[in-house]
Amino acid sequence: ALQAFQRTHGLTPDGIFGAETERALAPWLRGYAVHTVRPGDTLFSLAERYDGSLGAIETANPALDPFALRPGQRITVPLPFSVVPTDIPWCSALMDCAVDGLTHRYPQLRAESIGRSTLSRPIWALTAGDGLRRVLYSAAHHANEWITTPLLMKYLETLLRAAAAGETVFGYPAEDILFRAALTLVPLVDPDGVDLVTGALPEGEAKERTAAIAAEFPAVPYPDGWKANIAGIDLNLQYPAGWDTARAIKFAQGYDRPA
């Protein structure tokens, strides 16, 4: 499939995912293209060319005057598919693509890195809405529970799409939700651990270290059962809430020493 894509796009069909191939694939990985306006272009012609919709283009470019396009002007054109896949394993690189895609499709979505993981991967926080009621959702504290990440991201995408179209989510007007509340999502708390579990972590010292830790607990499947971050720390046990009880439970399960 990769070689066929390379041939179609005039690239060397070597089957290698190199820099040129990555650039050519970027619109399909991130869900949008950046089009440079040419004489005669209209939003309708762009929607036809990219198999998209006028509404999606207008949502992605809120300051755009559709009747005054200028040659050389750059326009974000959403492509006709979801940015958030739910049928493949997730990883930190996929999260980066999804964050980029959603913020370009829905510029009102605010994204920031609130920190870095042990391996320097960004820990993203995404905020939608400007209401007084503030709500925080987080996912993937535990690496082997990564399925919570696409669940949260798909909810966010569904909410943003519905708000842009004036539709409802579970019977509630999406625009009203974002007017009344500010929703902040931290959808991948443990990017390194998730990369380990889903097979995206490359070979190297970090992976060798996790294998050594896992060898001390042979009853836990490795890497599928890995819950901690890449340093062996259970992130969900780092909050001052019932910590003594959690420690007693972990000791009873045989986790009686630091990793």
PLM feature segments, named:
Residues W124-L132, A140:
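Short beta-strand-to-loop junctions in surface cap/lid or active-site-entrance loops
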Residues Q3-T12:
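Extended, structured, electrostatic nucleic-acid-contact surfaces
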Residues L2, S120, A140, L185, ...:
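Divalent metal-coordination and catalytic microenvironments
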Residues A56, P78-L119:
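Short glycine- and acidic-rich boundary segments immediately preceding or forming the N-terminal edge
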Residues L132, W146-A259:
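Active-site/substrate-binding loop(s) of hydrolase catalytic cores
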Residues A1-Q3, R23, P27-G52, Q73, ...:
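Primarily a LysM-type cell-wall glycan-binding module
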